[in-house]
Structures are given as structure tokens and as C-alpha cells.
Amino acid sequence: MAKKSSSRLPKRKGEYTYRGKTVSELQELSLEEFAELLPSRERRSLKRGFTDGQKKVLHEFKEGKKIRTHHRDMIILPEMIGKTIEIHNGKGFVSVDLQPEMVGHRFGEFAPTRSRVSHGSAGVGATRSSKFVPLK
């Protein structure tokens, strides 16, 4: 049997693609073309346009400034890949390096607002059974 020759190139290991597009292809797309690749919720958000605060963040990205933002609802675009941004989590700013895998997600997904609480052991007298524990 003869092998079928496919027009598809074999995918190189380690190369990230988003909906079949490599990072360099994504960066060449216009905002409208990129929006068509996104899931419906993010696509609708982009089609509505950016708020004034989000426009300011985009402008700072293009200038190459260090960015600190409270805009947790902003969608990560391909032109942001490779940059570092500080996202507010309600208490402080969390530094996040934007990777290709983060495209299409929102800033807030990478700056958790709640931390896990680990309580210490109960003190002497905190429970009825600890009344009888000798105090050194």
C-alpha cells in the first residue's frame, strides 16, 4: 500500500499553537481576526471594545513600560506574550510572566485573590481535653 502524502506539516515538539496557529501567526493577526479564534465569551468582550482603563494598559504595553494594573478582566492578547505584568489581587500586586499558553485568558486568572489558610495548633485551654495537659 502506498502512503498518503498529507499537506500538513508535522508539528514540532514543544511548539505551542492556539487553535492551530503558532505564536508568530497569532501576533500577525488583527484584533478582529484574533477575536474569531476565541471562545464566545471572550470574543463578545473584545467585540464590545476596550474600556478607557484597558486602552491605557494596551498603550503602556506598546511603549514597553512596566505595568501594574487593577484590570483583572482584561483578555491576554498575542502581542502581550513575553512581557511581565503586575496584577492586583486585592491586597498587593502579583508579578506574572505572560506565556503563550495564557493567550485568551483573563489577567485575574493568574493572580488568585484567596490564599489557603493553615491554622496552627490549638493553645492550652482551647478545648476541654487540653485542660489536663501539664504546663511544663
UniProtKB/Swiss-Prot annotation:
Keyword Transferase: no
One GO term describing the cellular component: cytosolic small ribosomal subunit
Chain residue ranges for the region called Disordered: 114-136
Family annotation (InterPro entries): Ribosomal_uS19, Ribosomal_uS19_CS, Ribosomal_uS19_euk/arc, Ribosomal_uS19_SF
One Pfam short name: Ribosomal_S19
The entry's keywords: Ribonucleoprotein, Ribosomal protein, RNA-binding, rRNA-binding
SUPFAM superfamilies: Ribosomal protein S19 (SSF54570)
GO BP term, pick one: translation
A molecular function GO annotation: structural constituent of ribosome
Cited function: Protein S19 forms a complex with S13 that binds strongly to the 16S ribosomal RNA.
UniProt record similarity statement: Belongs to the universal ribosomal protein uS19 family.
UniProt protein name: Small ribosomal subunit protein uS19
Lineage of the organism: Archaea, Methanobacteriati, Methanobacteriota, Stenosarchaea group, Methanomicrobia
